[in-house]
Amino acid sequence: MAAASSLHAAPRVGSSSSFSSSSSAGRRSASAARSVRVAAAAGSCAARRAGGRMVARAAVASKAESPASAASSKSDGHEVLLFEALREALIEEMKEDPTVCVFGEDVGHYGGSYKVTKGLAEMFGDLRVLDTPIAENSFTGMGVGAAMKGLRPVVEGMNMGFLLLAYNQISNNCGMLHYTSGGQFKIPIVIRGPGGVGRQLGAEHSQRLESYFQSIPGLQMVACSTPYNAKGLMKAAIRSENPVVLFEHVLLYNLKEKIPDEEYVLCLEEAEMVRPGEHVTILTYSRMRYHVMQAAKTLVNKGYDPEVIDIRSLKPFDLHTIGNSIKKTHRVLIVEECMRTGGIGASLRSAIIDNFWDYLDAPIMCLSSQDVPTPYAAPLEDATVVQPAQIVAAVEQICQ
């Protein structure tokens, strides 16, 4: 992969409203100042490594249902919705680096299908916030080409399901060009957008494409679940020299949380300890984090002490954090909204068996969505997705 660390970004220079005002000479002259900022961000990431492996921050190991990092407690901070946190990340990075740009359908003056990019066109101009035709293969390919030429594009899919139309560009170009060019090209592109099972959006708008993208060489994948990690992961993804797919769940955009006023960047390869426990390790991500925490309340009342980890990094997995938890609890439950066949849970189960088999006292259980197209009718839709009661029953079975 282009760079093992997600924060080894190119030197970043001052704000600009257009690409033309940032010449190569200007970027070189400002590189020293900008590299200090990038090095500081990379240092904060490296500080959480142990022997080159990512470790979970003790600061987030609280038993709250939606814990923010301890960083948010160090200042008064401000409350934002998740989609606003994503927007803040885009604004901050676009102000600092004139090579950051946004492509997609209605991302400009309309502000995106979920208003993540609202106001960006007025701030940065139509050259950097570019409305495109309804042609995912075209503007995704354009983003890959822009990344090859030194820009840092953020490509928005109006819905993750529509990005299947750009699968060729994401797979054969985005993921592989660094390798097939012999390292001549880096592809610092972010591909993001809403996905997951919403509320009666129908099969075509309820896609979970994690399983589609995980097998593509060269891609990193992360899934945000709170305003805090949405902003931190977005900033890290933009700075990465690797292509990053950022999954945003359609039902989480209106989550509200207080985040720090000061700048912060998260590590792309790091899981989050949501709730420490002793009896069983529950691994989850995205929307299922909240189903798991709802189930955890019931489990605590029944005398169980589950440890909940939001894996966040879907590729690669943070096996250091996951492994430390398994060595403590010796039992694992994986909860995902992805399909069971070939899903993230299947890959995670395989990785755990390969690396931590000797520490398991019970078979790994995996709760996934049913392998069916998502129904439109609400009761049927709910029946295809993992519910808190199923999580409680699974933990009781594992801990027998």
From Swiss-Prot:
CDD domains per UniProt: TPP_PYR_E1-PDHc-beta_like (cd07036)
Compositional bias segments (type: Low complexity): 9-34
Pfam families in the cross-refs: Transket_pyr, Transketolase_C
UniProt-listed Enzyme Commission number(s): 1.2.4.1
Domain of life from the UniProt record: Eukaryota
Known catalytic reactions: N(6)-[(R)-lipoyl]-L-lysyl-[protein] + pyruvate + H(+) = N(6)-[(R)-S(8)-acetyldihydrolipoyl]-L-lysyl-[protein] + CO2
Top EC class of this enzyme: oxidoreductase
InterPro entries linked to this entry: THDP-binding, Transketo_C/PFOR_II, Transketolase-like_Pyr-bd, Transketolase_C
Binding site for thiamine diphosphate: E136
Keywords: Chloroplast, Metal-binding, Oxidoreductase, Plastid, Potassium, Pyruvate, Thiamine pyrophosphate, Transit peptide
Binding site for K(+): I189, A237, I238, N242
Record GO biological process: pyruvate decarboxylation to acetyl-CoA
GO molecular function, one term: pyruvate dehydrogenase (acetyl-transferring) activity
Region (Disordered): 1-34
Cofactor(s) in the UniProt record: thiamine diphosphate
Record-level GO cellular component terms: chloroplast
Transit peptide, residues from-to: 1-57
Signal peptide: none
Gene3D superfamilies for the chain: 3.40.50.920, 3.40.50.970
Subunit text: Tetramer of 2 alpha and 2 beta subunits.
Function according to Swiss-Prot or TrEMBL: The pyruvate dehydrogenase complex catalyzes the overall conversion of pyruvate to acetyl-CoA and CO(2). It contains multiple copies of three enzymatic components: pyruvate dehydrogenase (E1), dihydrolipoamide acetyltransferase (E2) and lipoamide dehydrogenase (E3).
Protein name in UniProt: Pyruvate dehydrogenase E1 component subunit beta-4, chloroplastic
Organism for this UniProt entry: Oryza sativa subsp. japonica
